[in-house]
Amino acid sequence: KNWAVLVAGSDGLPNYRHHADV
């Protein structure tokens, strides 16, 4: 199961991070 979340990057811009839920 994969889900993506929006997190703040080091530059302050939102980045998509993919996490694997096994």
Swiss-Prot record:
InterPro entries: Peptidase_C13. It catalyses: Hydrolysis of proteins and small molecule substrates at -Asn-|-Xaa- bonds. One of its GO terms (biological process) is proteolysis. It is an enzyme of class 3 (hydrolase). Its EC number is 3.4.22.34. It comes from the Eukaryota. Keywords: Hydrolase, Protease, Thiol protease. GO terms for molecular function: cysteine-type endopeptidase activity. Belongs to the peptidase C13 family. This is Hemoglobinase-like protein 2. It comes from Fasciola hepatica.
